[in-house]
Amino acid sequence: TGGGNLFYSFNAGMGNNMIGLYAYYLASPLNLLILFFNDIQIFVLVLTILKLALAASASAFFMRNRFSSIDNIWIIVLATCYGMMSYSISQKCNLMWLDALIMLPLICLGIYRLIMQNKKTFLFISVLVMVVCNWYMAYMCCLFSVVYFFFELFCTDEKKKYIVTIVKYGLTMLLAVMSSMVLFLPTAMNLLQGKGIESTTDYTPGFHIGIKTLIKGLLPGIRMQKAFGTESQGIMLFCGTFVLICAAAYFLSKRSLKEKILSALVLSFLVVSATFIPLENVWNGFRKANSYYCR
């Protein structure tokens, strides 16, 4: 509007490059739905509900294809828990971040299909869409994809194919990111000229929260305490009592010991990543999180 367009706007101070703002806040195709709304508040409400519903649907699609033996009723319950977990609710004010909740299960499914079926297209498209929708959360999704890839890989017994599969995964991820360069490259250049070059990151070993706060994050009814201009306190881990029961039952079951050990290692690494300051900063793009930590 006025003197602004997708690439540059004179409505921002003395003028500013808009590509970085667009790539971070507005690139999600779901934002086009605003064309059907006259009231911005109603649009934000509908968009929030839609994104949470799509996140639940994506997780259901993942579980249906990854764990074919699970009954549909349990998939619906678990998918609802995913879509309505405390992280989703606490981060609904960061609407642009919710796209990651939609795409992450699809990226995981793409990894599974790459390893088990040698199909690379689904992973390629999922990563490409995520980078285009929100490059910042795509970075975290790509980091998690590395963790999940090695989990799925080591759960298989085909050790002779490990190297080949790793190469295929790496090339697929690289091609997906490179394919998004039409938007990602100017965004990266814009960041390097401004906010991206500032750094107050602290890599001093230490934990952001204690064990008491960590346990609280697994319980219902815990809110993220956040005041404007301050760091958030607490960690949002709760995704339903049913999920906690299922997790306990899984580790007590007769499933493969190797799989349970790998699962425990992944969970432990993710918990440490959310609490250990140096690792937390790595997940945040090698920067200290501003206000909302444990993203």
Regions found by a protein language model. Name each.
Residues 1-7, 29, 165-263, 269, ...:
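Periplasmic/ER-lumenal interhelical loops and adjacent helix-loop junctions
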Residues 1-59, 80-101, 191-196, 203-231, ...:
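Membrane-interface coil-to-helix junctions
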Residues 38-42, 69-70, 94, 132, ...:
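Juxtamembrane loop-transmembrane helix junctions in multi-pass integral membrane proteins
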Residues 40-44, 168, 266:
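Short alpha-helical transmembrane interface motifs in multi-pass membrane proteins
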Residues 48, 97-100, 141, 232-240, ...:
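Alpha-helical transmembrane segments of polytopic membrane proteins
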Residues 53-65, 72-154, 168-188, 193:
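Membrane-embedded helix bundles of polyisoprenyl
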Residues 129-131, 284-291:
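Transmembrane helix-loop junctions at the membrane interface of multipass transporters and ion channels
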Residues 158-165:
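Membrane-interfacial, low-structure loops and terminal tails that flank and connect transmembrane helices
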